[in-house]
Each structure stands twice: as structure tokens, then as C-alpha cells.
UniProtKB/Swiss-Prot annotation:
This is Alanine--tRNA ligase. The gene is alaS. One of its GO terms (cellular component) is cytosol. It catalyses: tRNA(Ala) + L-alanine + ATP = L-alanyl-tRNA(Ala) + AMP + diphosphate. It is found in: Cytoplasm.
Length: 878
């Protein structure tokens, strides 16, 4: 029997059927586009499903393919077995020949038998066939073509040999070809109690689609019968290379040996299984990424992440301290890139994703393994790990459940799956309750639906400024849409992961750009919903964007750097405020903008000029000391024990980020920060004010904005010097002299106004209006100082005993009312009551003062024409 390479097996299969008038159809994407119920393409027939059902037509009636396939989810979830058994894989190639109404059973069996025994030269006595127990036609074909007796044709009664597409639709019996590895391998023929052994291996499966299932009780013959076959490339190659384990074929051995040269650990013992896991998962991960799947916390992205993290854990077991997977990619591309050019085209992209994911997971892997070791120290063989701990590993450390199962497998420790699911449901319920009344009631359900379907957005921005991300949702006018086509449309975009920071913890969201194949998008803000969904506020600038598109997300680096500078400065400021103002100071709120920072604190009095100077000096000293800024992940409990300050407005998980700046500042924070305090440059407080009882607000600028502030103030100073015709040395004296002169002029002007408003008794008697024995003087005077009006009104009422004076000044929407009443008549006409009545009439809220002199405000200047009538009514009614 000739020995073939993997590439030769694939090539010979395709060439054989092409020679027999089959059209070579390229492999489809691993993402099924015609079957939303399917996670991944897992067989060769998937791309022909609609052809078999008659929904679509192809320009050919026979086809041959080498289809890349993945089985790692749903009923095909064999992940825990991959690497440990001889034949389980997450990624494999399925060779297949298909007939759509052309040939049927006899020709299909002939093609298979001829290829195996003549082209691949397999010994006939090593081959067996299975058929469905009622398929006498297939039995006759095998006897005729292969010369098999009844002892070589095994009749199977179970559904293993009857295939259906679903409850209804095309279906039919199967015939499988088995190869005998020899009696030195344990196992028995199909249908026997030893069938699960590795001696007899299925190498080819033929489905004879001859029926249509109408309902559970009705099955009819199809007018057009079809053939669907599948041969696992890896299995067939193992047979042709005289090995019983798929991982011993040339393709896997090339990857495994290449890996060994990097990690320097011999391929023996337990390490052998780790090498196999890495080789298999490298293929699955690379091909999935090439077809547009990106690791995430939901759907296909989560399956990919599970595969990648399992491989990374095995790399860790081999002692690999640095990211490994991306270093193996060139070997895979070299081996398979010519057959699958999409792998070669996407090589740099795949490499970035592999490296990014491994860097992210590496930090939590060791801590998660430490926790798992501690929690299982007392467990014995056959014991069960609690669902609570399994969930903590999943939720806090990113351990997929099957990764934890895989780790415990060799110790024969199982997991409490029911307890795990209970923890998962409890977390979802807590999340919903925590956000009740959050102010997002109108769109709460939309965000909950997104989170339920897609999970949380993974934030990449701690280490990356740009990344390839997949768009999972688009929102316009509070509604989910499938695409955005109109230029300049504003909308929200959600992706599986992003380098954009969503506004939280006081730090404003990032801005930047998103470039997809057919679109340019401007990101004008980044928001966060339900604590973990990052939404990009976007404007479409070019083309159109669709759900499912992959795109390059790139933040505005300068904008982010300014946010980092001001955010790190708030941490230093917080620590210094404790030192200067006292330990009573607590943070009440903050805003980190790219151009300034705002920090609200609990403090009962104004911060003095001397204190502000001291605060600035100490903050700038810490900046100049250029302390390293370190970020550490730890449990909330450990952080509290270390005395870490929690920041206002943050929601903390069981694992938190602790930001440390030298020995000065130690805080919990999810924001982005500088690498060293010196990166801040400089710090300057621009204002200090009260915003509520016992709460002060400090605003400040950092870095280049301090320089900008100095220049603005210098420019202002120059302008004042020029206006006052002096220099900075004489400026204070000149300003004081000017202010003093202004006071003198104001006094003179006040005297002038008072003199103008003053009346003699005779003038009062002549100008006042008599209403029921009471004199009234009413004037509307534009833009005169209230102080002057009070004095003038009081002067007049002091001269006579029966006078009411009303002055109204101001314009537009701000009016000031002054009322004075002679003391002799205040028991009947109270100035406060009159002022209040007039204020309410003019759209104000009342006033205050004394019975003889009161003031109030108003806003409705249009009613001034009716004031006299209002006064007349009030006086006559009293």
C-alpha cells in the first residue's frame, strides 16, 4: 500500500472525481449563510442544502469538494475529547462527492470502491460496509461491485444508518465503509459491543437521499434522488500513512514538531496531549478568524474563545510564558495556505487576534488556576467541584466551563452543572434588578435584549488603540436595524469588542473612526449601557454599514492621551486633598474631559488661596517625581484589605483594577491612565466653588492646557496693560486708583439720580394720584440701580403721611419692583403685600422687606401696561 501525504490524499480525491465529470466546488465559509440554525459548517453537504431541498439550482449535477469544517458546539461539542482521543478534532476537512439527481446508489458505491482499492490501493480484505437493515438495494450493489459476502455487509437498525435533514424534508439510508487497522488495535465491528474501539474506523459515509419525510407518519419516494458523501481527510490520511492516530499524520506532526522547537519540551507523557490540543486548536482558531469570527462572549465568538483559551491553557502547561499561538501561524499557513488562500490573505489579521487574545487571557489564567488548585485540594477522585466556584472561574477569570472540566478531567473530578446554571441565572437576575430605575426605562428592554443575546462588550483599550471588531447591533431612533445607508445618519453601533472606552467612572468616552470594507464612520462619543455594553455614537460618512460586518476600530490617540492625563491627575489630586484638607475629604463626583478635569469633594468651607497653592505644589511635585503607574487585577476583598479608595460612580465586579501611582495614590478604577506621572506634564487649578451644602468643586487643567492657560492669561494681562497705559509693575496701583475713582463717580451719579427723583411736598401733592384719600406715585424707570430707587422712594414717603410709591425698573424678562408706604398708613397698606401682589402679577414669585419698604421681582414685561389698574384695584379694595 502506497504512503500518501495529506496534500496528496486531498488532491487525488478531487482529481479522481473531476476526471469522472464532477465539478470541483471550492470550500464554503465556516459560517453557514443558508442555515441560521447551524453554528458552523460541519460537513460537506451544508453548502448544498438548498440544492438537495430543491430551493436552488446549480449549473452542475455532480460536485466534489474538500470542505473545511468545525464541530465544537451543540450536539457536536467534543471539545473535551480533542487531543486525548485518536480521531476527535474541532477543525477537520471533509472530502465529498455529490449527485443532484444524476447517479445513485450503484454508481456512488462504484466510485468509492474504485477510488479506495485502485487509486489508494487499500487491501480489499481490510474493508467492510454497513447498510440500513432494510436497504436490500445497497446490499446487492456491494455484492456486485466489491464481491462482498453477507459477513462483510453489516446491517444496522439504528438511525446511525438513516439520515434525515430534520423532522421533514429529504432523507434516506446510509452506507458506511470501515477500515480494519488490525487485531493489534482494540475494538470490534459496528453493531457489536466493542464498536467504540479504534480497530474498525469509518472512513467514508454515503447518504442515499431517496425519500421525503412529509410528517412523522408519512414518507414518500423522491422523484429526483441524490447522493451526499463524506470522507474525513485526516482519518483517510492516517490509514494511508499506516498510523492509527490522526495526530500522527504528517500535517499534525509538522505543527507539533514546530511547536516543540519553540517551547523546548519533549513530546512525551502528558505533554503529548498538550501538543495535540494546540495543533488542533490552532487550525480551528485560524480558519474561524479568517472567515470573520472574532473571540467574544457570545455565539460563535464565544466558541472560538473557548477553543483558543483551551489551547492557551495547554501552552501554559508546557511552560510557555509568552504568547505562543501566533508564532505557530506561519507554519500552518505554509502547510495549508495554498489550498485555502483565505488563510494566507488574512495571516496578519489572524496573527494579531491570536496574540491579543493570549495576552488578555494570560493575566487571568494563573490566578484562575491558583483558585482552582486551592478549591480542589481537599477533593478526591470522583468528587464534585461546586457550581459556585466553577461560575466564579467563568465570570471572574474567563474560564469557559469546559476548560475547567478539561483541567479536572485527569483527576476524575466532575462539576456541579446544576449549581453552575443556578449561579448564571442568579447573576442575570441581579443585573436586571440593579438597573431598575436607572433612568434608561425607555430603552432598558432593548439593552437587556442585546446583553442577553450577545453578552458584554469586551474592552481592549487598556492595551490597544485599534482593533478588528465585529458589528453585532445597530440602533437608530431607539430601534434595532440591520444596516445604515443614509450619509450623515447618527446612530449607535455595538461591537463584540472595542478599543473605545465607554463613558463611565467620570471619564468621557473616546472618539475616533471606524473603517469597514464599504464604509467610513466617525465616532463622536462612546457610551456604556447596563454597565458592560459599550455603544459607539456614530455618524455615517461614506458607504453603508451592516450588522455582521467586521471593521477596523481606531480611537483618536491624542484625545485618549488627554483623557489619560486628566484622569491620572484626579487620582493624584484626590490623594493630595487628603493631605492638605484632611482625611474627611471624600469624592462626590468627577468629570474627566480631554481639556480639563472636574473634581467634587465633601468639604464644608471654601478652599483658601493658600490651600490651593499648596495643593498645586504637591500635585506638581508628584508629577515631576515621575512615578510609575501600575495596574493590578485583584479581588474586591483584597483591594479593601489594602486600603484602596473606591471611586464614586463605579460598579465593581468581584475582580477589580487597582491603579497605583508610586506610594502616593492607590485607587479602584476602570479608566485609562498614563504610564508614568511625568506624562501628565503639569497641573493648575482654574476654579474652586460651592455646588451644594458641604460640597466643593475643583476644576483644573493639565499638560499642554496649562501652557495654553498661561498664554491666555498673559495675553489678557498685556491687553489690560495696553488699555490702562501702564506696565505690569504699575498695574496693581493703576487698577486700584481706577477702582477708587469709579467709586467716587458712582457716588456722584447716585446723588444725581436721587436729586432727579426727589420731590418737594408741594410737588408730591401735585404729581400724586389720589385714590380714596391715599396718594399714589407710580413710575416705570429703565435700568436704574435698586439702591437708588429704595432710597428715593423712602425719602418721599418720609415727607408725607398718606403716600404709596411704586418704582419698577428693568427690561426684557427681568423686572425689579420697589414699594414704599408712609408709616402712618402701613396698618392698612403693607409694602410687602403690595410688592408680592405685583410680583405674582408680573410672573415673579413674591418679595420681601418691611411694612414700609419692600422689593420684589418679575419677568412679564408685557403686563406693565396693566400695573396701574392692578394698583388701583388693590388700593380701593383695602
Amino acid at each position: 500500500m502506497t504512503k500518501f501525504t495529506t496534500e496528496e490524499v486531498r488532491s487525488k480525491f478531487i482529481t479522481y472525481f473531476k476526471t469522472n465529470n464532477h465539478t470541483h466546488v471550492p470550500a464554503s465559509s465556516l459560517i453557514p449563510h443558508n442555515d441560521p440554525s447551524l453554528m458552523f459548517v460541519n460537513s460537506g453537504m451544508v453548502q448544498f442544502k438548498n440544492v438537495f431541498t430543491g430551493q436552488t439550482k446549480r449549473p452542475y449535477h455532480t460536485a466534489v469538494t474538500s470542505q473545511k469544517s468545525v464541530r465544537a458546539g451543540g450536539k457536536h461539542n467534543d471539545l473535551e475529547n480533542v487531543g486525548y482521543t485518536a480521531r476527535h478534532h474541532t477543525f477537520f476537512e471533509m472530502l465529498g462527492n455529490f449527485s443532484f439527481g444524476d447517479y445513485f446508489k450503484e454508481q456512488a458505491i462504484y466510485y468509492a470502491w474504485n477510488l479506495l482499492t485502485k487509486e489508494f490501493e487499500l487491501p480489499k480484505d481490510k474493508l467492510y460496509a454497513t447498510i440500513y437493515h432494510t436497504d436490500d438495494e445497497a446490499a446487492s450493489c456491494w455484492k456486485k461491485i466489491a464481491g462482498f459476502g453477507d459477513d462483510r455487509i453489516i446491517k444496522i437498525k439504528t438511525n446511525d444508518n438513516f439520515w434525515s435533514m430534520g423532522d421533514t424534508g429529504p432523507c434516506g439510508p446510509c452506507s458506511e465503509i470501515f477500515y480494519d487497522h488490525g487485531e493489534q488495535i482494540y475494538g470490534g465491528l459496528p453493531g457489536t459491543k466493542y464498536e467504540d474501539g479504534d480497530r474498525f474506523i469509518e472512513i467514508w459515509n454515503m447518504v442515499f437521499m431517496q425519500y421525503e419525510q412529509i410528517d412523522k407518519d408519512t414518507r414518500i419516494e423522491l422523484p429526483q434522488k441524490s447522493i451526499d458523501t463524506g470522507m474525513g481527510l485526516e482519518r483517510m490520511t492516517a490509514v494511508l500513512q499506516h498510523v492509527s492516530n490522526n495526530y500522527d499524520i504528517d500535517l499534525f506532526q509538522e505543527i507539533i514538531n514546530f511547536t516543540e522547537n519553540i517551547v523546548k519540551v519533549k513530546i512525551e507523557g502528558e505533554a503529548k496531549f498538550s501538543y495535540r490540543v494546540i495543533a488542533d486548536h490552532l487550525r480551528a482558531s485560524s480558519f474561524l478568524i479568517a472567515d470573520g469570527v472574532i473571540p467574544s462572549n457570545e455565539g460563535r465568538g464565544y466558541v472560538l474563545r473557548r477553543i483558543m483559551r483551551r489551547a492557551m491553557r495547554h501552552a501554559h502547561m508546557l511552560g510557555s510564558q509568552e504568547p505562543l499561538m501566533y508564532k505557530l501561524l506561519p507554519k500552518l499557513v505554509d502547510l495549508m495556505g495554498s489550498v485555502y488562500p483565505e488563510l494566507k490573505r488574512a495571516e496578519s489579521f489572524i496573527s494579531r487576534i491570536l496574540e491579543q487574545e493570549e495576552i488578555r487571557f494570560k493575566t487571568t489564567l494563573e490566578r484562575g488556576l491558583k483558585l482552582l488548585t486551592e478549591e480542589t485540594e481537599t477533593l478526591k477522585k470522583g468528587n464534585e467541584l461546586s457550581g459556585e466556584i466553577a461560575f466564579k472561574l467563568y465570570d471572574t477569570y474567563g474560564f469557559p466551563l469546559d476548560l475547567t472540566e478539561d483541567i479536572l478531567k485527569n483527576r476524575d473530578i466532575s462539576i456541579d452543572h446544576k449549581g453552575f446554571e443556578e449561579q448564571m441565572l442568579a447573576q442575570k437576575e441581579r443585573a436586571r434588578k440593579a438597573w431598575l430605575g436607572s433612568g434608561e426605562s425607555k430603552t432598558d428592554q432593548l439593552w437587556f435584549d442585546i446583553k442577553e443575546q450577545h453578552g458584554s462588550t469586551e474592552f481592549l483599550g487598556y492595551t490597544l488603540n485599534e482593533a478588528e471588531c465585529k458589528i453585532i447591533a445597530l440602533i437608530k431612533d431607539n430601534n434595532l436595524v440591520n444596516d445604515i445607508k443614509k450619509i450623515d445618519t447618527q446612530f449607535l453601533l455595538i461591537s463584540n469588542q472595542t478599543p473605545f472606552y465607554g463613558e463611565s467612572g467620570g471619564q468621557m468616552g473616546d472618539i475616533g473612526t471606524i473603517f469597514a470594507k464599504d464604509s467610513d464612520i466617525e465616532v463622536i462619543d462612546t457610551l456604556k449601557y447596563l454597565g458592560s455594553i459599550i455603544a459607539h455614537k456614530c455618524i455615517l460618512k461614506k458607504g453603508q454599514i451592516n450588522v455582521g460586518d467586521s471593521a477596523n476600530f481606531s480611537i483618536d490617540i491624542k484625545y485618549r492621551q488627554n483623557l489619560r492625563i486628566h484622569h491620572s491627575a484626579t487620582h493624584i489630586l484626590h490623594a493630595v486633598l487628603h493631605e492638605v484638607l484632611g482625611q474627611h475629604v471624600t469624592q462626590k463626583g468627577s468629570l474627566v474631559a480631554p481639556t480639563y478635569l472636574r473634581f467634587d469633594i465633601s468639604h464644608s468651607k471654601a478652599v483658601t488661596h493658600e490651600e490651593i497653592t499648596s495643593i498645586e505644589d504637591k500635585v506638581n511635585e508628584i508629577i515631576r517625581d515621575n512615578h510609575e503607574v501600575n495596574t493590578t487585577l485583584m479581588t474586591t476583598e483584597d483591594a479593601v484589605k489594602q486600603g484602596v479608595m473606591a471611586l464614586f460612580g463605579e460598579k465593581y465586579d468581584s475582580e477589580v483594577r487597582v491603579v497605583k501611582m508610586g506610594e502616593t495614590s492607590l485607587e479602584l478604577c476602570g479608566g485609562t491612565h498614563v504610564r508614568r506621572t511625568g506624562d501628565i506634564g503639569s497641573f493648575k487649578i482654574t476654579s474652586e466653588s460651592a455646588i451644594a451644602a458641604g460640597v466643593r468643586r475643583i476644576e483644573a487643567v493639565c499638560g499642554e492646557f496649562v501652557i495654553k492657560l498661561i498664554r491666555e492669561k498673559d495675553s489678557l494681562l498685556k491687553s489690560i496693560e495696553n488699555s490702562l497705559k501702564t506696565n505690569k509693575n504699575e498695574l496693581v496701583t493703576k487698577v486700584n486708583n481706577t477702582l477708587e475713582r469709579n467709586k467716587e463717580l458712582e457716588k456722584e451719579l447716585e446723588k444725581t439720580h436721587l436729586a432727579r427723583l426727589d420731590l418737594s411736598i408741594e410737588q408730591i401733592e401735585k404729581q400724586a394720584e389720589d385714590i380714596k384719600g391715599v396718594k399714589l406715585i407710580y413710575r416705570h424707570i429703565e435700568n436704574l440701580d435698586n439702591k437708588v430707587l429704595r432710597q428715593a422712594a423712602a425719602n418721599l414717603t418720609n415727607k408725607v403721611e398718606d403716600l404709596i410709591v411704586v418704582y419698577i425698573t428693568g427690561n426684557n424678562d427681568k423686572l425689579s419692583i420697589t414699594v414704599a408706604v408712609s408709616k402712618a398708613i402701613t396698618d392698612k397698606y403693607n409694602a410687602c403685600i403690595i410688592a408680592k401682589e405685583l410680583s405674582l402679577f408680573l410672573g415673579g414669585s413674591g418679595g420681601g422687606g418691611q411694612a414700609s419698604l419692600a422689593q420684589a421681582g418679575g419677568s412679564d414685561i408685557g403686563k406693565l401696561t396693566n400695573i396701574h389698574e392692578k394698583l388701583y384695584s388693590f388700593i380701593t379694595a383695602s
